Amino acid sequence: MKWINTACIAMVITVNAMANALPINGMNTGQIAALYPNLFVPAAATFSIWSVIYLGLIGFVLYPFISRKALDSSVSLLFQLTCLLNISWIFAWHYLLIELSVIIMMAFLGVLIAIYKKLNSQNRLSFWLLDVPMNIYFAWICVASIANVTALLVKWGIELPYPELITVFLIGVTQVLVWFINSTKNNIPYSLVIIWALLGIILKRSYSSPFFPEIVVAAAAGILFTTMYTGLSWRNQLMTSKPV
């Protein structure tokens, strides 16, 4: 199973690299996103988080090689499914099948939720190589799912009134997610990814016109809330149990 996991992540990294190097269907991933402009999309630099995600996933597949404990077979199967969905999404997105890409993204998110529920590390090695990578992955796909649905609305030509307020609402959705995730189990990696995404939104607005100060204020407030609530959740966890 561990060799299959290794092959799967190698395929994911290869396909994602090809998507921008070739690129697939003549456009890179960012150029396609530009076809469906919306105020929720963060600055291009924000997407560098994929380097962190892939580095973490490499650690994830290496875990069975360096640990005496094998990775749960059900988690391995779910991980392999995420790899298939990741690759499928790339092709759907690059061939402008946005409706299909949303369906794939929702399935992708569902599988990551299943993995999130199954992982519960009992030692530092599994925490850093299993929990942290998957929490980062899960958080970013939450953000990507919101952006993907927004892109679909743009493709359909649905012009909602006051797009800046819609974006403020979407930022609010990220905060509901932070609250829900951290109220069940303190998750600093998840929160850090949300902060990163909100910083990307602020950066994008700083060099875009119009500026939309309400979006910047909402994103800044989101960063503050995420930091404070995650810190409070972490403190409560320390008071009730031993740290991992």
Language model features with spans:
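Alpha-helical transmembrane segments of multi-pass membrane proteins
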Residues: 9-26
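Membrane-interfacial loop-to-transmembrane alpha-helix junctions, especially the N-terminal start
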Residues: 70-79, 186-191
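Central hydrophobic cores of alpha-helical transmembrane segments
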Residues: 81, 189-201
